[in-house]
């Protein structure tokens, strides 16, 4: 039997008690959930905003300022590409690592664009990871998104 573990992005993992090294030693591979284009659970922006809400429960008016602060200190206040690369680089050597890339998002949310999928695939490969896992309801992803993820379709289409 093979055992794999979904882990939050490296910046979130310590905050939820996930130790990449310890968990990686128990699994055949780990899958960092590096979802930067979808606003769904485990998505980078979704989780960061949830943290801001959690620390603002006693003072809801402070939510917007805390959200902006968390985005600034994590580097997620602009282009997520650089942040994504930093998170890939922050993954400690733990055996087999297979990053998760979202191909689809939840119903009612904007789709993940093929150019974004291609960009994520490119950045994962540039970081030295040549395996990847297609995430977020792959059965609902369109064929072109799957082809882009697999490296079959061009990177310049949407």
How does the language model describe each region?
Residues 20-23, 48-51, 151-153:
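Short, hinge-like loop/turn segments at secondary-structure boundaries
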Residues 2-42:
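Substrate-binding cleft/loops of secretory-pathway carbohydrate-active enzymes
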Residues 26-45, 70-158:
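Substrate-binding cleft of secreted/luminal carbohydrate-active enzymes
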Residues 1-8, 93-99:
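Short beta-strand/loop segments at the ligand-binding rim of alpha/beta enzyme cores
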Residues 45-74:
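A solvent-exposed, charged loop/short amphipathic helix patch at secondary-structure junctions
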Residues 19, 59-62, 113, 142:
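Helix N-terminus capping/helix-initiation residues
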